[in-house]
Amino acid sequence: MYKIEWQPKAYRQLNKIAEKKTKISILDAVDTLVNWPNCKQVKSLKNRNGYRIRVGRWRVLFDVAKKLKILKIEEVKKRDERTY
């Protein structure tokens, strides 16, 4: 099992989301990442290192330290042209 670490930037972005239902959905999706690499809806990013998971219109961008078994949640963004 992997440990999940929230970067300060990602934590601030999550707290700025107004809808409580959306926050809960994002937290539930992040909790499924502890079973890495057996996770659904995870895709590798093409233009930079890391991965993303889709939660409705939101994207959670993260990186994996495989040797340390740590997932670093780097950003939580609403999907638009500038997301990736």
Regions found by a protein language model. Name each.
Residues 29-53, 83-84:
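A short, surface-exposed loop/turn module that caps and links secondary-structure elements
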Residues 16-23, 35, 39:
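Alpha-helix boundary/capping and short turn/kink residues
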Residues 1-5, 9, 15-16, 23-24, ...:
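Enriched for short, Lys/Arg-rich terminal
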Residues 14-17, 45:
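Alpha-helix C-terminal capping segments
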